[in-house]
Regions:
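Extracellular glycoside hydrolase catalytic/binding regions
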Residues: 99-130
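Extracytoplasmic "Venus flytrap"
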Residues: 3-7, 11-30, 60
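Short beta-strand elements in bilobed, periplasmic/extracellular small-molecule ligand-binding domains
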Residues: 41-57, 113-115, 164-184
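Short, well-ordered alpha-helical microsegments
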Residues: 87-89, 127, 153, 184, ...
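Short, polar/charged alpha-helical segment
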Residues: 24-44
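Extracellular/periplasmic bilobed ligand-binding domains
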Residues: 161-163, 167-232
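An alpha-beta-alpha
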Residues: 120-176
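Beta-alpha junction/loop-to-helix N-cap segments that form part of ligand/metal-binding clefts
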Residues: 27, 44-109
Length: 232
């Protein structure tokens, strides 16, 4: 079989487990749809596309090592991922600049890493304009931030804090919890003390669902708006 007859094999890194595992079925369906549409058009450069599923819901180092092993074995030609930023950063440590890498999830901002293509929403195009809109439409002037404790929520929170100050709004504080948190009692107590007009929720997947339900049970939905840029 000649090179042109071989499929283009893509490591498709999506969460199958963990907090972000709730997004897994949607991600896999999108991948299948993309392959079907490309196949109808003759593939890419006349070659079929084959997805190699990599579970991006595990520890970042474990995910990155699997991608690197596939690359070194000649088993993949590119990487496409919808997963958390901590996984992206680790994958880049192993294959950055070596393989085309399309990162489809929302992210912290612009990057200029060779071979990395960011197609998801940046804070300047999504979160920050939404803060302004919520102020205009609902009078949300005071804000708290609740997020998971890793790079994306922390960097978005920092961008939001600076934006709020520049736009004449108030940032009352931020709190971060580990991925997989199930008990948000302390977080809800903290929100009750601050009583913000709105809460920017930077929690992932199942964590966001559990927080939202606990927030409503506490009756905080009668006091504060919630805005989340990522919720299944």
């Amino acid at each position: 079989m000649t090179h042109r007859e071989l499929p283009i094999r893509i490591a498709y890194v999506v969460p199958v487990q963990g907090s972000a595992g709730i997004f897994g079925p949607s991600c896999e369906a999108c991948g299948d749809l993309a392959v079907a549409e490309l196949s109808c058009g003759g593939g890419v450069l006349g070659r079929e596309i084959e997805l190699v599923i990599v579970d991006g819901g595990r520890r970042p180092a474990v995910v990155a090592q699997e991608v690197a092993t596939l690359w070194r074995a000649g088993a993949i030609d590119a990487v496409v991922g919808w997963h958390i930023s901590a996984v992206r950063k680790e994958i880049l440590r192993y294959v950055g600049g070596e393989l085309p890498y399309v990162y489809a999830a929302l992210h912290e901002g612009e990057f200029r890493t060779p071979g990395l293509f960011m197609t998801g929403e940046s804070p300047g195009a999504q979160v920050l304009p939404a803060l302004d809109w919520l102020r205009r439409q609902f009078g949300a002037h005071t804000w708290c931030v609740v997020g998971n404790d890793y790079v994306w929520p922390r960097q978005i929170a920092a961008r939001a804090e600076a934006h709020l100050a520049g736009a004449g709004m108030s940032h009352l504080g931020s709190t971060f919890t580990p991925l997989g948190t199930s008990d948000f009692t302390e977080t809800l107590d903290w929100l009750e003390v601050h009583g913000p007009d709105a809460v920017l929720v930077l929690l992932i997947g199942d964590d966001a669902v559990r927080f939202g339900r606990a927030f409503a049970r506490r009756g905080l939905d009668e006091i504060s708006l919630r805005f989340s840029p990522i919720l299944e």
